[in-house]
Amino acid sequence: MASCKLIIEDEVNIKIEGLDVDVRRKLANALKFEVPYARYMPQYKLGRWDGKVAFFGIGGTGYVNHLDVVQEVLAKNRVQIVDIDDRRHPIQLDFTPVTENYWKDQGVQWPEGHPAEGEDIILRDYQVDAINNFLNNPQSLQQIATGAGKTITTATLSHISEPYGRSLVIVPNKSLVEQTEEDYINCGLDVGVYFGDRKQLGKTHTICTWQSLNILDKKHKDGSAVLSLAEFLEGVSTIIVDEVHQAKAEVLKNLLTRNLRNAPIRWGLTGTVPKEKFEFESI
Protein backbone atom coordinates (compact mmCIF):
# COMPACT_ATOMS: atom_id res chain seq x y z
CA MET A 1 0.00 0.00 0.00
CA ALA A 2 1.29 3.47 -0.93
CA SER A 3 1.54 6.23 1.66
CA CYS A 4 1.26 10.01 1.77
CA LYS A 5 1.48 12.97 4.13
CA LEU A 6 -1.47 15.26 4.90
CA ILE A 7 -0.68 18.88 5.77
CA ILE A 8 -3.54 20.90 7.28
CA GLU A 9 -2.17 24.36 6.60
CA ASP A 10 -4.91 26.37 8.32
CA GLU A 11 -8.67 26.30 8.91
CA VAL A 12 -9.36 26.08 5.17
CA ASN A 13 -6.47 24.72 3.12
CA ILE A 14 -4.77 21.33 2.90
CA LYS A 15 -1.89 19.87 0.95
CA ILE A 16 -1.07 16.22 0.32
CA GLU A 17 2.52 15.20 -0.33
CA GLY A 18 3.88 11.93 -1.66
CA LEU A 19 1.11 11.10 -4.13
CA ASP A 20 1.87 9.97 -7.64
CA VAL A 21 0.37 12.03 -10.43
CA ASP A 22 -2.31 9.45 -11.29
CA VAL A 23 -3.84 9.62 -7.80
CA ARG A 24 -3.63 13.41 -7.79
CA ARG A 25 -5.46 13.46 -11.10
CA LYS A 26 -8.16 11.17 -9.69
CA LEU A 27 -8.58 13.49 -6.70
CA ALA A 28 -8.86 16.48 -9.01
CA ASN A 29 -11.51 14.70 -11.11
CA ALA A 30 -13.48 13.63 -8.03
CA LEU A 31 -13.65 17.25 -6.91
CA LYS A 32 -14.43 18.78 -10.29
CA PHE A 33 -17.94 19.97 -11.06
CA GLU A 34 -19.61 21.14 -14.25
CA VAL A 35 -20.83 24.71 -14.66
CA PRO A 36 -24.22 24.36 -16.43
CA TYR A 37 -23.95 27.64 -18.31
CA ALA A 38 -20.29 27.14 -19.33
CA ARG A 39 -21.16 26.69 -22.99
CA TYR A 40 -22.21 30.34 -23.17
CA MET A 41 -18.89 31.64 -21.85
CA PRO A 42 -16.11 32.87 -24.19
CA GLN A 43 -13.33 30.78 -22.59
CA TYR A 44 -15.33 27.60 -23.15
CA LYS A 45 -16.24 28.54 -26.72
CA LEU A 46 -12.57 29.20 -27.48
CA GLY A 47 -11.56 25.82 -26.03
CA ARG A 48 -9.50 27.37 -23.22
CA TRP A 49 -11.66 25.93 -20.42
CA ASP A 50 -13.38 22.58 -19.97
CA GLY A 51 -16.46 24.13 -18.35
CA LYS A 52 -15.73 22.69 -14.91
CA VAL A 53 -14.65 24.11 -11.55
CA ALA A 54 -12.00 22.15 -9.63
CA PHE A 55 -11.59 22.12 -5.86
CA PHE A 56 -8.41 20.04 -5.79
CA GLY A 57 -5.25 21.07 -7.60
CA ILE A 58 -3.08 18.65 -9.54
CA GLY A 59 -0.21 19.82 -7.32
CA GLY A 60 -1.91 18.27 -4.29
CA THR A 61 -3.70 21.30 -2.81
CA GLY A 62 -7.31 21.26 -1.63
CA TYR A 63 -9.70 22.27 1.12
CA VAL A 64 -10.39 20.96 4.62
CA ASN A 65 -14.12 20.61 4.00
CA HIS A 66 -13.42 18.09 1.22
CA LEU A 67 -11.31 15.76 3.36
CA ASP A 68 -14.05 13.11 3.37
CA VAL A 69 -13.91 12.88 -0.42
CA VAL A 70 -10.10 12.92 -0.38
CA GLN A 71 -9.96 10.05 2.11
CA GLU A 72 -12.46 8.02 0.08
CA VAL A 73 -10.44 8.41 -3.13
CA LEU A 74 -7.19 7.56 -1.34
CA ALA A 75 -8.74 4.41 0.16
CA LYS A 76 -10.01 3.27 -3.26
CA ASN A 77 -6.50 3.70 -4.63
CA ARG A 78 -4.88 1.90 -1.68
CA VAL A 79 -3.10 4.99 -0.38
CA GLN A 80 -2.73 5.46 3.36
CA ILE A 81 -2.16 8.75 5.19
CA VAL A 82 0.79 7.91 7.46
CA ASP A 83 1.65 11.41 8.66
CA ILE A 84 -0.60 14.36 9.54
CA ASP A 85 0.98 17.78 10.00
CA ASP A 86 -1.73 19.96 11.56
CA ARG A 87 -0.57 23.58 11.44
CA ARG A 88 -3.81 25.15 12.65
CA HIS A 89 -3.51 27.46 15.63
CA PRO A 90 -4.58 25.41 18.68
CA ILE A 91 -7.77 26.69 20.30
CA GLN A 92 -10.30 25.08 22.62
CA LEU A 93 -13.80 26.33 21.85
CA ASP A 94 -16.27 25.95 24.69
CA PHE A 95 -19.80 27.21 24.06
CA THR A 96 -22.76 26.97 26.42
CA PRO A 97 -26.16 26.44 24.76
CA VAL A 98 -28.43 29.48 24.84
CA THR A 99 -32.08 29.84 25.80
CA GLU A 100 -34.68 32.39 24.76
CA ASN A 101 -33.64 34.45 27.79
CA TYR A 102 -30.01 34.90 26.70
CA TRP A 103 -30.20 38.70 26.49
CA LYS A 104 -32.61 38.99 29.42
CA ASP A 105 -30.04 37.18 31.56
CA GLN A 106 -27.49 39.79 30.42
CA GLY A 107 -29.83 42.54 31.64
CA VAL A 108 -30.31 43.86 28.10
CA GLN A 109 -33.60 45.49 27.09
CA TRP A 110 -34.78 47.18 23.93
CA PRO A 111 -33.45 50.75 24.07
CA GLU A 112 -35.27 54.07 24.00
CA GLY A 113 -36.92 54.77 20.66
CA HIS A 114 -37.40 51.10 19.78
CA PRO A 115 -41.04 49.94 19.31
CA ALA A 116 -40.49 47.50 22.21
CA GLU A 117 -38.65 50.09 24.35
CA GLY A 118 -38.03 48.90 27.91
CA GLU A 119 -38.99 45.28 27.22
CA ASP A 120 -36.58 42.37 27.60
CA ILE A 121 -34.95 41.11 24.40
CA ILE A 122 -36.31 37.59 24.03
CA LEU A 123 -35.03 35.24 21.36
CA ARG A 124 -37.57 33.32 19.31
CA ASP A 125 -37.50 29.53 19.34
CA TYR A 126 -36.14 29.26 15.78
CA GLN A 127 -33.41 31.78 16.62
CA VAL A 128 -32.43 29.71 19.66
CA ASP A 129 -32.30 26.58 17.49
CA ALA A 130 -30.17 28.28 14.84
CA ILE A 131 -27.74 29.73 17.39
CA ASN A 132 -27.30 26.41 19.20
CA ASN A 133 -26.76 24.59 15.90
CA PHE A 134 -23.98 27.05 15.10
CA LEU A 135 -22.45 26.65 18.56
CA ASN A 136 -22.40 22.88 18.09
CA ASN A 137 -20.71 23.34 14.71
CA PRO A 138 -18.16 26.20 14.80
CA GLN A 139 -17.65 25.94 11.04
CA SER A 140 -21.04 25.55 9.43
CA LEU A 141 -23.76 26.88 7.17
CA GLN A 142 -27.48 27.19 7.87
CA GLN A 143 -30.44 28.11 5.74
CA ILE A 144 -32.29 30.87 7.57
CA ALA A 145 -35.22 32.55 5.88
CA THR A 146 -35.30 36.29 5.26
CA GLY A 147 -37.35 37.96 8.00
CA ALA A 148 -36.32 35.38 10.61
CA GLY A 149 -34.38 37.92 12.67
CA LYS A 150 -30.93 37.16 11.30
CA THR A 151 -29.41 40.34 12.74
CA ILE A 152 -30.31 39.41 16.33
CA THR A 153 -29.01 35.91 15.61
CA THR A 154 -25.66 37.24 14.39
CA ALA A 155 -25.44 39.74 17.26
CA THR A 156 -25.92 36.89 19.73
CA LEU A 157 -23.25 34.78 18.00
CA SER A 158 -20.81 37.70 18.01
CA HIS A 159 -21.37 38.30 21.72
CA ILE A 160 -20.93 34.63 22.59
CA SER A 161 -17.67 34.43 20.63
CA GLU A 162 -16.13 37.55 22.25
CA PRO A 163 -13.81 35.52 24.55
CA TYR A 164 -11.98 34.22 21.47
CA GLY A 165 -11.36 37.55 19.73
CA ARG A 166 -12.96 39.98 17.32
CA SER A 167 -15.82 39.13 14.99
CA LEU A 168 -16.21 40.24 11.39
CA VAL A 169 -19.70 40.24 9.90
CA ILE A 170 -19.80 40.35 6.10
CA VAL A 171 -23.09 41.34 4.47
CA PRO A 172 -23.90 41.81 0.76
CA ASN A 173 -24.83 45.52 0.70
CA LYS A 174 -24.68 48.82 2.57
CA SER A 175 -28.31 48.80 3.72
CA LEU A 176 -27.74 45.48 5.50
CA VAL A 177 -24.61 46.93 7.13
CA GLU A 178 -26.77 49.61 8.75
CA GLN A 179 -29.59 47.22 9.67
CA THR A 180 -27.15 44.83 11.32
CA GLU A 181 -25.35 47.67 13.10
CA GLU A 182 -28.65 48.84 14.58
CA ASP A 183 -29.32 45.52 16.34
CA TYR A 184 -25.71 45.26 17.54
CA ILE A 185 -26.13 48.69 19.13
CA ASN A 186 -29.52 47.64 20.55
CA CYS A 187 -27.76 44.71 22.24
CA GLY A 188 -25.06 46.99 23.67
CA LEU A 189 -22.18 45.54 21.64
CA ASP A 190 -18.96 47.39 20.82
CA VAL A 191 -19.55 47.62 17.08
CA GLY A 192 -18.19 49.56 14.14
CA VAL A 193 -18.87 49.56 10.42
CA TYR A 194 -16.56 49.76 7.43
CA PHE A 195 -18.02 50.94 4.14
CA GLY A 196 -18.21 54.10 2.06
CA ASP A 197 -17.26 57.14 4.12
CA ARG A 198 -17.85 55.34 7.44
CA LYS A 199 -14.66 53.56 8.43
CA GLN A 200 -14.62 52.77 12.14
CA LEU A 201 -11.58 50.92 13.46
CA GLY A 202 -10.63 49.39 16.79
CA LYS A 203 -14.03 47.83 17.54
CA THR A 204 -14.69 44.36 18.93
CA HIS A 205 -17.19 43.66 16.16
CA THR A 206 -17.02 45.04 12.63
CA ILE A 207 -19.76 44.93 10.00
CA CYS A 208 -18.81 45.45 6.38
CA THR A 209 -19.41 44.40 2.79
CA TRP A 210 -16.98 42.15 0.94
CA GLN A 211 -16.72 44.91 -1.66
CA SER A 212 -15.32 47.30 0.99
CA LEU A 213 -12.67 44.76 1.99
CA ASN A 214 -11.71 44.28 -1.63
CA ILE A 215 -11.36 48.04 -2.16
CA LEU A 216 -9.21 48.34 0.99
CA ASP A 217 -6.91 45.57 -0.25
CA LYS A 218 -6.55 47.14 -3.71
CA LYS A 219 -5.90 50.64 -2.33
CA HIS A 220 -3.18 49.39 0.01
CA LYS A 221 -1.49 47.49 -2.81
CA ASP A 222 -1.43 50.58 -5.05
CA GLY A 223 -0.20 52.77 -2.18
CA SER A 224 -3.32 54.91 -1.75
CA ALA A 225 -4.27 53.44 1.66
CA VAL A 226 -2.08 53.33 4.77
CA LEU A 227 -4.04 50.51 6.41
CA SER A 228 -3.52 47.03 4.99
CA LEU A 229 -6.20 44.36 4.88
CA ALA A 230 -4.07 42.18 7.17
CA GLU A 231 -3.92 44.98 9.76
CA PHE A 232 -7.66 45.57 9.47
CA LEU A 233 -8.35 41.87 10.09
CA GLU A 234 -5.91 41.51 12.99
CA GLY A 235 -7.47 39.73 15.96
CA VAL A 236 -10.48 38.40 14.02
CA SER A 237 -11.37 34.89 15.19
CA THR A 238 -15.02 34.78 14.14
CA ILE A 239 -16.36 35.31 10.63
CA ILE A 240 -20.09 35.53 10.04
CA VAL A 241 -21.22 35.79 6.42
CA ASP A 242 -24.81 36.76 5.68
CA GLU A 243 -26.20 35.50 2.35
CA VAL A 244 -23.19 33.20 2.21
CA HIS A 245 -24.32 31.72 -1.12
CA GLN A 246 -22.63 34.79 -2.58
CA ALA A 247 -19.33 33.33 -1.33
CA LYS A 248 -19.03 31.82 -4.79
CA ALA A 249 -17.96 35.31 -5.86
CA GLU A 250 -14.21 35.02 -6.40
CA VAL A 251 -13.35 38.05 -4.26
CA LEU A 252 -15.24 36.75 -1.22
CA LYS A 253 -13.83 33.26 -1.74
CA ASN A 254 -10.29 34.67 -1.73
CA LEU A 255 -10.98 36.62 1.46
CA LEU A 256 -12.26 33.54 3.27
CA THR A 257 -9.58 31.13 2.04
CA ARG A 258 -6.56 33.44 2.18
CA ASN A 259 -6.81 36.56 4.32
CA LEU A 260 -9.14 34.93 6.87
CA ARG A 261 -7.78 31.40 6.61
CA ASN A 262 -6.79 31.17 10.29
CA ALA A 263 -10.14 32.19 11.83
CA PRO A 264 -11.41 29.12 13.73
CA ILE A 265 -15.07 30.17 13.95
CA ARG A 266 -16.79 30.44 10.56
CA TRP A 267 -20.56 30.72 10.28
CA GLY A 268 -22.64 31.26 7.17
CA LEU A 269 -26.30 32.22 6.91
CA THR A 270 -28.34 32.09 3.73
CA GLY A 271 -31.92 32.19 2.62
CA THR A 272 -30.97 30.27 -0.53
CA VAL A 273 -28.80 27.16 -0.54
CA PRO A 274 -27.33 26.87 -4.07
CA LYS A 275 -28.84 24.08 -6.15
CA GLU A 276 -25.89 23.70 -8.49
CA LYS A 277 -23.26 21.31 -7.13
CA PHE A 278 -20.27 23.52 -8.00
CA GLU A 279 -21.84 26.51 -6.20
CA PHE A 280 -22.70 24.46 -3.11
CA GLU A 281 -19.19 23.03 -2.89
CA SER A 282 -17.69 26.53 -3.10
CA ILE A 283 -19.23 27.46 0.25
What are these regions (language model features)?
Residues 1-88:
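N-terminal accessory nucleic-acid engagement/regulatory domains that precede
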Residues 67-127:
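Pre-P-loop entry segment of helicase/translocase ATPase cores
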Residues 70, 237-238, 243-283:
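Post-DEXD/H (motif II) to motif III coupling segment of the RecA-like Helicase ATP-binding lobe
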Residues 122, 126, 136-161:
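Walker A/P-loop
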Residues 148-187, 252, 275:
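Conserved Walker A/P-loop ATP-binding site and its immediately adjacent core
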Residues 162, 223-236, 256-263:
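Short, conserved loop/helix-junction motifs that constitute active-site signature segments
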Residues 174-176, 199-200, 211-214, 245-246, ...:
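Conserved nucleotide-binding/hydrolysis micro-motifs of P-loop NTPases
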Residues 184-226:
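Inter-Walker segment of RecA-like/P-loop motor cores
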